[in-house]
């Protein structure tokens, strides 16, 4: 029996080396296959690993990075907004103020079609915002309803602005002189009552015959609508002014 410290025979060591070499060759083949994968996938996987790690802010809430818009593509769509006949002349006069926000801010293609009396808007490769077409349509619609261009531009800059439309007959059925008096109470002498409601509630109001359009935030529209409805129902302007003062003081405290 050989001693435990005796040197092993050379043939046995060759067999061991052959087995180890076969294993190494097999590993090299697997490495070549893994190297054939594009580097972009590896980078994407590393990014996923980094993104999977949750980052917490000071209060302990998870903090997520903003979604990148580089990979987002806007569909090529078009929209036509009809223009009423009585708004065509104001549209032509203020066209130089209307199209720059649509072209420069929203990156839309705009055309005024005089034959069909519509404003046509299209998205293109430069358009970034997916809601640009809808914002542009709302802006043009606000102008066609009778709002000033400077007031309608606020729809492009702020997301929480809306337009609410209702008629006098939705509140109370009035005809003839009664309807005229109700509209006169809303406007007031030289528009004094209408301006008071606008300033107190931070809204813009358009009186188009028996239709009333209100532009503003959700809560502001509700306050302005309550004042207009009370005038239609016959409340004296003095009482409405008192309520508006209360509303204005509350809004100053809130904001």
Curated annotation (Swiss-Prot):
BP GO annotations: endonucleolytic cleavage in ITS1 to separate SSU-rRNA from 5.8S rRNA and LSU-rRNA from tricistronic rRNA transcript (SSU-rRNA, 5.8S rRNA, LSU-rRNA); endonucleolytic cleavage to generate mature 5'-end of SSU-rRNA from (SSU-rRNA, 5.8S rRNA, LSU-rRNA); proteasome assembly; ribosomal small subunit export from nucleus; ribosome assembly
KH domain: residues covered: 176-228
InterPro entries listed in its UniProt record: KH-I_PNO1_first, KH_dom, KH_dom_type_1_sf, KH_PNO1_2nd, KRR1-like_KH1
The keyword Flavoprotein appears for this protein: no
Keyword annotations of the record: Cytoplasm, Nucleus, Ribosome biogenesis, RNA-binding
GO molecular function terms noted in the UniProt entry: rRNA primary transcript binding; unfolded protein binding
Alphabetical list of CDD domains matching this protein: KH-I_PNO1_rpt1, KH-I_PNO1_rpt2
Domain of life: Eukaryota
Annotated region (Disordered), positions in chain: 1-71
One Gene Ontology cellular component annotation held by this UniProt entry: cytoplasm
Pfam families for this protein: KH_KRR1_1st (PF17903), KH_PNO1_2nd (PF22891)
Self-association and partners: Component of the small ribosomal subunit, ribosomal RNA processing complex (SSU RRP complex).
Main function: Required for small ribosomal subunit (SSU) synthesis. Has a role in the processing of early nucleolar and late cytoplasmic pre-RNA species.
Family the UniProt entry places it in: Belongs to the PNO1 family.
Protein known as: Pre-rRNA-processing protein PNO1
Source organism per UniProt: Debaryomyces hansenii (strain ATCC 36239 / CBS 767 / BCRC 21394 / JCM 1990 / NBRC 0083 / IGC 2968)
Lineage of source species: Eukaryota, Fungi, Dikarya, Ascomycota, Saccharomycotina
């Amino acid at each position: 029996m050989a001693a435990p410290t005796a040197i092993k025979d050379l043939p046995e060591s060759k067999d061991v080396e052959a087995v180890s070499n076969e294993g190494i060759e097999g590993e090299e083949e697997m490495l070549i296959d893994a190297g054939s994968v594009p580097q972009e996938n590896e980078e994407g996987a590393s990014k996923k690993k980094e993104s999977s790690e949750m980052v917490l802010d000071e209060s302990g809430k998870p903090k997520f990075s903003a979604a990148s818009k580089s990979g987002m593509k806007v569909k090529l769509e078009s929209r036509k907004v009809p223009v009423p006949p009585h708004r065509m002349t104001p549209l032509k006069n203020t066209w130089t103020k209307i199209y720059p926000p649509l072209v420069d801010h929203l990156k839309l293609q705009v055309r005024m079609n005089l034959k069909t009396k519509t404003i046509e808007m299209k998205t293109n490769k430069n358009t970034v915002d997916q809601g640009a077409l809808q914002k542009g349509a709302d802006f043009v619609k606000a102008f066609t309803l009778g709002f000033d261009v400077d007031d309608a531009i606020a729809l492009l800059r702020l997301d929480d602005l809306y337009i609410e439309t209702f008629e006098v007959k939705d509140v109370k059925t009035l005809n003839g002189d009664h309807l005229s008096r109700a509209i006169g109470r809303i406007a007031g002498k030289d528009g004094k009552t209408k301006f008071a409601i606008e300033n107190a509630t931070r809204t813009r109001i358009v009186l188009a015959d028996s239709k009333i359009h209100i532009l503003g935030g959700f809560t502001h529209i509700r306050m302005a609508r309550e004042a207009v409805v009370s005038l239609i129902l016959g409340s004296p302007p003095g009482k409405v002014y008192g309520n508006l003062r209360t509303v204005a003081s509350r809004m100053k405290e809130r904001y």
